[in-house]
Amino acid sequence: MHFRDFNYNFSSLIACVANGDVFSESETRAKFESLFRTYDKDITFQYFKSFKRVRINFSNPLSAADARLQLHKTEFLGKEMKLYFAQTLHIGSSHLAPPNPDKQFLISPPASPPVGWKQVEDATPVINYDLLYAISKLGPGEKYELHAATDTTPSVVVHVCESDQEEEEEEEEEMERMKRPKPKIIQTRRPEYTPIHLS
């Protein structure tokens, strides 16, 4: 066949099975396995019911490629079955690699600094002196044009409000009320109780 010229790295297929009977009924499982045993006799199956997937492990990559070419997108018990090559992940070590040291160290030095670690100086705060100067020049009752009008945009004008006399008076009255002592609440005397049977 034409595909035997290629060098395949994968010897496992992942089958996406829509029919859930493959995972529970032994007869359906035997039918499913017989489809692939024609391509390789030393084949093993791993069933993942919750994912609706079956991993099929072949003894060589050519058998896996042949099975995929013949059975991909074919019907199995009335539903389409899709086959994909399983991706193998090669990790150099059996241990997890430590995370990259990016952004692990703050400005203060860590307890055991790594090789090449240097102290970073704090940046000076950015102060906009032009803005502070403009704010200091603002006075109450005046208007300031921030942006002149053009043919397509309106002008932006700031009106600085004067403090309202009425508001100040209300605030003073409120302060006086708070300073006054609270009036004493005299409790009313409870009326005399005379039982009905005695009257």
UniProtKB/Swiss-Prot annotation:
Signal peptide interval: none
InterPro entries on file: Calcipressin (IPR006931), Nucleotide-bd_a/b_plait_sf (IPR012677), RBD_domain_sf (IPR035979), RCAN1_RRM (IPR034906)
UniProt record, GO biological process: calcineurin-NFAT signaling cascade; calcium-mediated signaling; locomotion involved in locomotory behavior; negative regulation of calcineurin-NFAT signaling cascade; negative regulation of smooth muscle cell differentiation; response to estrogen; response to ischemia; response to mechanical stimulus
Residue numbers carrying Phosphoserine: S108, S112, S163
Gene Ontology CC terms, in alphabetical order: cytoplasm; nucleus
SUPFAM superfamilies for this protein: RNA-binding domain, RBD
Gene Ontology MF terms in the entry: calcium-dependent protein serine/threonine phosphatase regulator activity; nucleic acid binding; protein phosphatase 2B binding; protein phosphatase inhibitor activity
Domain of life of the source: Eukaryota
Keywords: Phosphoprotein
One Pfam family matching this protein: Calcipressin
Region (Disordered): 162-199
PTM comment text: Phosphorylation increases its ability to inhibit calcineurin and decreases protein half-life.
CDD domains listed in its UniProt record: RRM_RCAN1
Sequence ranges of Acidic residues compositional bias: 163-175
The keyword Metal-binding is assigned to this record: no
Role of this protein: Inhibits calcineurin-dependent transcriptional responses by binding to the catalytic domain of calcineurin A. Could play a role during central nervous system development.
Sequence similarity: Belongs to the RCAN family.
Subunit structure: Interacts with RAF1, PPP3R1 and PPP3CA.
UniProt name for this protein: Calcipressin-1
Organism: Rattus norvegicus (Rat)
Gene (name only): Rcan1
